[in-house]
Amino acid sequence: MKKILVAIFAISLVPNISLAGPKAEVLHWWTSGGEAKALSVLKADFADKGGEWTDMPVAGGGGDAAMQTLKARIVAGDAPAAAQVKGPAIQEYDDQGVIKPYNIDAVAKAEGWDKLVSKRVAQHMKCNNFTQYCAAP
């Protein structure tokens, strides 16, 4: 797949991820061979840091099916800990109050994301009038 996707994992969907042995159900549509291989790197890194990753792949539709699933889970009060979401949709979820609090902003500041991430990408990862990171690039 040669498309350039601005794909993120909105860790802030669920505000209470414990630092000691965090568990995260991750909704995504990276299901093809190459995508799944790339995702395995993220899973391994999370596991290496003591995390327990529960995979929730949703195939088909270039992410449309996954977004329908995510919306249904949010409405049911059962949002996953993290989800792959495309840029502008992040602000839409924020406008609905789904992402708050912006837990990932502290990580972004500590790691200096504003110096590492282009402004164009960062604008899709920030909420609260584009002042705080609410998603990871």
Model-predicted segments: where are they?
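Positively charged n-region of N-terminal signal peptides that target proteins for export
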Residues: 1-4
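Early extracytoplasmic/lumenal segment of secretory-pathway proteins
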Residues: 22-25, 31-90
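Sec/Tat signal peptide C-region and signal peptidase I cleavage site
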Residues: 16-20
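Hinge/lid segment of periplasmic solute-binding proteins
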Residues: 87-137
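Bacterial N-terminal signal peptides
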Residues: 7-15
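Conserved donor-binding loops in enzymes that form glycosidic bonds
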Residues: 28-29, 137
